[in-house]
Amino acid sequence: MLVVALCFVSACTTSPRLKARALAQQHGFTERLFETRPFVLFGLYHPGISPQPKTLRVYIEGDGHAWESRTRPASDPTPRNPVALDLAMADPGTDPVLYLARPCQYVQDEDRRYCTKRYWTSARLGQNVIDSLDAAITQAKAICGAEQVILVGYSGGGGAAVLLADKRQDVAFLGTIAGNLETDAWTQLQGVSPLAESLNPMTVASSLQRLPQRHLSSHADTVIPPEISAKFCQATGQPHSCVVVNDVGHGGSWQAYWGYDCQFEK
């Protein structure tokens, strides 16, 4: 019985959701569930210390644990290595901060009722996914009373951030880290099936030419190499917005390279 109990406790303590909660508590974040259509989205929110905050800073998670193998989708896309969560926790600013998970990440039971594997595979950037993220950001913005948002997305969350920036009128700054900003080129590069039910961020690049932005990639990233974001930066007319470093892999500690100060004056 003791062995069984110890195994149960060990399983609980390694739960990605409990790990996220514990990290959030250490940094003064609280859990929020956003009721949107069709998804319930998991978020972690910090109110910041500004008495009258103007800006909400949003960090959007990557695709998470989307695949068990190259041919078998995962049953739960909750990230094992939540890079965007680490980025949010490391934000040194005074503004409110929202960590926003992608659909079906971290949620359980009835909150997963609309979760099917297409939403973390072929439809990971589908219109209803973007609409759901958009609704959650609007709810969080109302909570803190912010006038504008800064969007920062990691990996596939970078693509989501781009599509949200095109959709919303209140985005002051767009940032991506190892962002999948040209999904057709990426699937061809990796030799995987096209994201047939998803929007391609590249298609909205020209509409974002006047938006301040920064797109960080790394030569050491073999999952989404710099050439993917370079195509996007050229299309926005802001080639200088692409910043390339040398020694961080796709799932590495990007917060050491991000340069949070690029957002502060926005």
Give the role of each language-model region.
Residues 9-11:
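C-terminal motif of bacterial Sec signal peptides marking the signal peptidase cleavage site
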Residues 13-15:
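Bacterial signal peptide processing site
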Residues 18-48:
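N-terminal cap/lid segment of alpha/beta-hydrolase-fold proteins
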Residues 37-40, 47-101, 105-108:
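Short, surface-exposed "cap/lid" segments of acyl-processing enzymes
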Residues 113-143:
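Alpha/beta-hydrolase active-site loop
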Residues 152-157, 161:
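Gly/Ala-rich beta-loop-alpha elbow adjacent to hydrolase catalytic centers
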Residues 179-180, 184-252:
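The feature captures the conserved acid-bearing segment of alpha/beta-hydrolase catalytic domains
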